Amino acid sequence: MPEIIVIAHNIRSTHNVGAIFRTCEGFGVQRLILSGYTPYPDLSLQPTPPHCAYHLEETVRADPRLPHIREKITRQIHKTALGAEALVPFDYQPELDLEQFAGYHIVALEQAPTSVSLQQYQPPSKLVLLLGEEVHGIPAETLSLVDDIIEIPMYGQKEAFNVSVATGIALYALTTAG
């Protein structure tokens, strides 16, 4: 099974974030990075590594959000994460920084002209799975920075799966390939 880090970049829905936490926990993801405007649970309530949350900057450790906003978002994420937010090592990064993953293969989950079908993809031993915004996906300028682009074939009339559903499908395929 490959070593996997997941990045959820610019995901709007707290319910999607919670479901992504729960899915990451189920597939043994090493770390979840929430970046951009993706909502994130209360950082001050998380245990320190190696048991749970990673915090890259001390200023982030003391959660900068207003208490009522922080508590509301944490409750909303918990509704679908059901405690997985306390089990999956995570951190919040305001900006997407793919350069920090030396030694990892960066794989975007997106529909693009150069994407490879998830069914045909052979995952490397260490990878970062990049997820993008629910409606617009991952911008072209970001896709130009990744090593591979994979997509889930669609057989119905809709263009794409919900991001949390797609995460589950992709993680299943990546962890059971080979």
Regions from the PLM with identified roles:
Residues M1-G178:
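Post-transcriptional modification and biogenesis factors for structured RNAs
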